[in-house]
Amino acid sequence: MDELKIHKLDEVIESFINYLIVECGLSRNTILSYSHDLQAFIKFLLSKNILDFQDVRPDTITSFIISEKQRSLSINSITREVVSIRMLFKFMLSERKLQRNPLASIASPKLWKRLPSVIPTYKIDKLLSIFDIKTKIGIRNNAILELLYATGARVSEVAAIQTDWINLEYGYMKCRGKGSKERIVPLGTKAIEAIQNYLNTARPKIKNSQNSTYLFLSKGGKPLRRENIWVIVKNCALKAGIKEHISPHMLRHSFATHLLENGADLRSVQEMLGHVNVSTTQIYTNVSKQHLKAVHRQFHPRE
């Protein structure tokens, strides 16, 4: 890594801090706050091998916001960091040290509050690898979490699934969503394996299972309610050593975001999620924007 470039980043920050002290007359605590925020930003830039503020793009800022959100920083802390970065860029523009403002197209903090919480893929892997598949409940819980992540289904939709809504041969599942609207959602290989194992080895051992048409049953043979599934997901996250709050809806968010990050088109994701309007699905493009922008930079002939 180019030490001169790293030094150049620090030089710009130093000039900005001097400006805040001399020109703006800000208090020591405010100066320290700006400095702390900007050092966090520089650390992020270096992790992405960005060694010059000229190379910062809007998707870099979006990626930074998501990174801070995944570190469980509060919205207020992230907003303060972005305000500090915005002030830095305004200073650089006024000093002709920056040609364009990467923050110009970034939405207001109100939008960030609406950004879905997404579970990183490495934590998904941890979450899906903790089950005791020698017990009927472990096998059932494994099937539930694999299905949640594989389909992006709402927790209420998963609780309502009937056994004949699943077609493992063709790898599809019927979902009944809001307003009783039905949709067909593909199942991935891992989810098919987990559900097949549950149907073959665990569900038949559950009390009164032969008398129920519901896919997921409690120990007593009653259909699992959505509240039960919330508790299952929460307990599985704790068992996996994940300290952050994890919910079924976060698995839905992660399903959509990870699909978009890996190149899925928005309309297909909309259909799988059961959104009536594509604008509802577009919130996930704000989360995965850094990936899409990178694809554009790599493949567009005029980029």
What is the predicted role of each segment?
Residues 1-303:
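Conserved catalytic core of the tyrosine transesterase superfamily
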